[in-house]
Amino acid sequence: MKRIAVLTSGGDAPGMNAAIRAVVRQAISEGMEVFGIYDGYAGMVAGEIHPLDAASVGDIISRGGTFLHSARYPEFAQLEGQLKGIEQLKKHGIEGVVVIGGDGSYHGAMRLTEHGFPAIGLPGTIDNDIVGTDFTIGFDTAVTTAMDAIDKIRDTSSSHRRTFVIEVMGRNAGDIALWAGIATGADEIIIPEAGFKMEDIVASIKAGYECGKKHNIIVLAEGVMSAAEFGQKLKEAGDISDLRVTELGHIQRGGSPTPRDRVLASRMGAHAVKLLKEGIGGVAVGIRNEKMVENPILGTAEEGALFSLTAEGKIVVNNPHEADIELSSLNKSLS
C-alpha cells in the first residue's frame, strides 16, 4: 500500500489532531503518501482530498478539535453516498483510509472495507462508549475539563450552602459523569447505567445539611435527563429551595488535550498505519491493559452494554474500564 488517507468524522474530541499527526508521520516513515480528507465523509464525497506532509501537521499535537474539520453526513449510510465517496478515493489513488471518530464513523469505515478499501477505525469521542477499548481519544481531556469546572462550582456552592446539579456530556454512557464525579468527591453521581430514587437523593441532601455540610454536588450524565428537568423533579420530590443547575456543554469537547490523550492518540495513529501497510482493514484499534489491540469493526460499531447490573447490586463495567463499583456508592456521599 503506497497511498492512504485520513479523516475525522462525527463529534470532535481533543486528541484528534495528535492522531492525525501520528498517521501522517508514521506513513511518511513507511514510505507512503498521505492525503487528508476534509469535512469527514461529506468531504470525501465532495472530493475535498488533499496531500499532507510532515509540515502540514507541525505544531498540532497540542491543539484541540481537528484541523481536518468534521461533519455529520448521514447520506453515507446509503449506497449512493458510499459509491460517490469511493469514486473520489479511486480518483486520488487512495488505497486505504484511517477513520477517526465514534460508532457512526465506524459504520462508514466498515462500508468502505466491504467495497474493497481497507479502513481502520480509531476511537475518537469524549463519550468513551466504543466497545473493545478501555479508553477513547478525548475522554481523559473531557473528564479533566469537567473536573476543573466542578471544582470551581463547588467553591461557589460552599459559599452559599447550595445544591448544584451539574450536567456533563457522554450521550448514552455515564463514563464522564462517573469519573468526574469520583474525582471531585461528588455527593451524588447519576448515570444511565444505574437506577436511582429521587426521594433517596432528597433524604441524602437534607441529611448532609443537617450534619453541617456546606454544599451538595450532584453530577448528572446527560443520558439520564437534562439538568433542568432533574432539578425540577428534585424540587417536586422535596423541599430543596436553594438549588442551581448547570450544563457544562461543549466546553468538554474543546481545549488542549491532556498528555494521556496525546500519547494514546499518537500510539493509535501509528498502529493504524502499520496495519494498513500489512493490507489489514475492517478493524478498529483499541487499548487494553495499555497494549494496542484490534477488533472487527462490525462488532465494535454496534452498540453494546457498557455496564451491567449484577444480582448483588454491583455495576460491572464491561467496557471501557475493568472495575466493580458498588451501586450504593453512587447514591451516597463520596466526599
Swiss-Prot record:
Keywords: Allosteric enzyme, ATP-binding, Cytoplasm, Glycolysis, Kinase, Magnesium, Metal-binding, Nucleotide-binding, Transferase. GO terms for molecular function: 6-phosphofructokinase activity; AMP binding; ATP binding; fructose-6-phosphate binding; identical protein binding; metal ion binding; monosaccharide binding. Its main location: cytoplasm. It is found in: Cytoplasm. ADP binds at R21, A22, V23, V24, R25, R154, G185, A186, D187, K213, K214, H215. Pathway: Carbohydrate degradation; glycolysis; D-glyceraldehyde 3-phosphate and glycerone phosphate from D-glucose: step 3/4. GO terms for biological process: canonical glycolysis; fructose 1,6-bisphosphate metabolic process; fructose 6-phosphate metabolic process. Substrate binds at T125, I126, D127, R162, M169, G170, R171, E222, R244, H250, I251, Q252, R253. Its EC number is 2.7.1.11. PROSITE patterns: PHOSPHOFRUCTOKINASE. ATP binds at G11, R72, Y73, G102, D103, G104, S105. The keyword Kinase applies. It catalyses: beta-D-fructose 6-phosphate + ATP = beta-D-fructose 1,6-bisphosphate + ADP + H(+). This is ATP-dependent 6-phosphofructokinase. It comes from Streptococcus pneumoniae serotype 2 (strain D39 / NCTC 7466). The lineage of its organism: Bacteria, Bacillati, Bacillota, Bacilli, Lactobacillales. The gene is pfkA.
